[in-house]
Amino acid sequence: MEAFLVSTGIVALAEIGDKTQLLALLLAARFKKPWPIVFGILVATVANHALSGALGAWVSTQISAGVLRWILAASFLAMAVWMLVPDKLDDDSDAKPPRWGVFATAVLMFFLAEMGDKTQIATVMLAARFDAYLAVVTGTTFGMMLANAPVVWFGERVTRLLPLVVVHRVSALIFAVLAVLAIWSPF
């Protein structure tokens, strides 16, 4: 349960103000069809985070616990610093949408936008940290949906309620705490 809750919280916080959340807002404004967008986000996230979680689980079997502890601590610390740098989505409002429909467009755009993103890297690290692949992937996916579905449904009003700088600082603090815990707690 700890892996699920930590994964959900970390990713939900990390996603606020992230480029994929901005992408959700852009797709909602452009297509005005929330359900296909939300289902597209879900499918893309499950696929991306399942692969990321598998990579993290594999890494944890290839590296000794002592070395992995320091790698994870350094990675969590790097994520803490990275969380303090807000994402920006390139303005691509003049581009014509692909002809695949709203759902397929959302799946493709979200899957690609997640490549190398904070939440994907967090999923790899969390899967390496916890010996609970399904709980991590389910938690990170749930965190993505918690952050993105309301943006699709309620649009810009949601992002105005929370100052992004506060959310990013809280996320950075959580990653820093995870870095310390990775060093001092047994796996």
Where are the model-predicted features located?
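Juxtamembrane transmembrane-helix termini in multi-pass membrane transport proteins
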Residues: 2-63, 122-141
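Short hydrophobic "helix-edge" motifs at membrane interfaces and signal-peptide entry regions
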Residues: 7-9, 104-108, 153
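Hydrophobic/aromatic residues within the transmembrane alpha-helices of Major Facilitator Superfamily
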Residues: 8, 12, 16, 46-47, ...
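Membrane helix-loop-helix hairpins that form the core translocation module of multi-pass transporters
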Residues: 32-101, 150-173, 180
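Short, structured loop/turn "capping" segments at alpha-beta junctions
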Residues: 85-91, 118-122, 134-137
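Selected transmembrane alpha-helices and immediately adjacent juxtamembrane segments
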Residues: 94-120
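Hydrophobic alpha-helical transmembrane segments of multi-pass membrane transport proteins
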Residues: 142-151
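Juxtamembrane boundary at the C-terminal end of a transmembrane helix
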Residues: 180-187
